[in-house]
A protein has these predicted regions:
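Surface-exposed extracellular loop regions of Gram-negative outer-membrane beta-barrel proteins
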Residues: 31, 67-84, 96, 131, ...
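Outer-membrane beta-barrel channels and translocator barrels
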Residues: 14, 43, 55, 65-68, ...
Length: 352
């Protein structure tokens, strides 16, 4: 979690957020897992906000006319102050940057174009110095001390863009042609060696563990990693929605192309009192040694059809949703057909 940057949700730009932990409708996803639906707000006039703290700063600006609206947001975060309070002392240099933009242009009475963009650049550098941790009980206290050499340097870059062309033939129908691209580049590198001592502590008269009774274990370890991930995803979708009385019919077709380049080279060596662990007596082995080279290109096709019926009663509103989703993945030649149905109830008191 030390490398964790900014969430995709920018509170200054988002109008509504929907989340489902599973069992969602056919219009979302090919797997019955969680889904996050973010709706960006449309500024009604010129607006802006600025905030700053010891952990970072944010700024956003929006502007709107009859045909054109724009919304921009910039965020910067650094959690070095929080990380410096951990048991492992050292130089923490994290920096997380995020820029998002949302543009809409209504070039005809029934046509609208929109563009969503996101740039996220996260850097994390850590040079550990030492770690001193005490644990155990009042009668059996231990102390674990480590001195470090080396550092860790990570970089995570994400670029995302989506263009949508919307057509409104009447007030009940909407068509949308969308294309999006996602690119990520992740690099994790570290070489950190540590020399550690595990000591037994004796209790003083006031009950505090201060006196060192002797070393229980002495050793060293070395962690190494050169991991890189490059992935790009390009998707094109055609979607539609129509309201027929109390029913809302939705459908969609999507083609998605994926390209992944993954390299993993990671190992850890441990030496305790002059013996490499695990000790076999015949060879020097690592605690673990990971090596992987993966290159993958694939195509995905998906389609869905969904109907939502709303029934209002004296007690509240019932929402019945049923649909069918079909998907094909070229990587494993697998076709999945997923029927989905759900019933929800909103009490009348909550509607008001």
């Amino acid at each position: 979690g030390q490398q964790e940057g900014l969430s995709i949700i920018n509170p200054d730009m988002v109008g509504a957020v929907g989340f489902s932990s599973g069992g969602f409708s056919a219009e979302y996803g090919d797997k019955m897992s969680s889904v996050l639906d973010i709706i960006y707000k449309h500024p009604e006039a010129f607006e802006g906000s600025v905030s700053a703290s010891f952990l970072g700063a944010t700024a956003s600006v929006g502007q709107s006319t009859k045909k054109f609206s724009q919304l921009h947001g910039v965020r910067y975060k650094t959690n070095s102050t929080l990380l410096s309070s951990l048991d492992t002392k050292g130089e923490y240099e994290p920096s997380f940057f995020d820029y998002q933009t949302y543009l809409t242009y209504k070039f005809a009475p029934k046509w609208e174009a929109s563009l969503l963009g996101n740039i996220s650049i996260n850097n994390y550098k850590f040079t550990p110095h030492e770690r001193n941790t005490s644990f155990g009980t009042a009668t059996d206290a231990k102390q674990f001390k480590v001195y470090f050499d080396g550092y860790e340097k990570d970089k995570f870059e994400t670029y995302f863009g989506a263009f949508s062309l919307n057509f409104f033939p009447d007030k009940y129908t909407q068509w949308a042609l969308m294309t999006s691209a996602f690119v990520t580049n992740e690099l994790v590198t570290y070489d950190i060696a540590g020399q550690y001592w595990l000591d037994d502590l004796a209790n003083s008269e006031d009950g505090e563990s201060t006196e060192n009774k002797g070393a229980l274990g002495v050793g060293t370890y070395h962690e190494h990693a050169r991991n890189r991930l490059r992935a790009s995803v390009v998707a094109t979708s055609l979607k539609g929605a129509t309201k027929l009385g109390q029913n809302e019919l939705k459908w969609g077709l999507t083609h998605q192309y994926e390209k992944i380049h993954d390299r993993v080279r990671e190992w850890e060596m441990r030496d305790s009192a002059g013996y490499s662990l695990p000790h076999t007596g015949q060879s020097v082995e690592m605690i673990y040694n990971l090596f992987s080279r993966q290159d993958m290109e694939s195509h995905r096709l998906s389609a869905y059809l969904q109907d939502t019926y709303r029934l209002r009663t004296l007690w509240g509103r019932f929402i019945f949703t049923g649909g069918l989703r079909a998907s094909y993945w070229g990587f494993n030649k697998e076709t999945l057909i997923s029927p989905r149905a759900s019933i929800s109830f909103i009490p009348a008191a909550n509607e008001q």
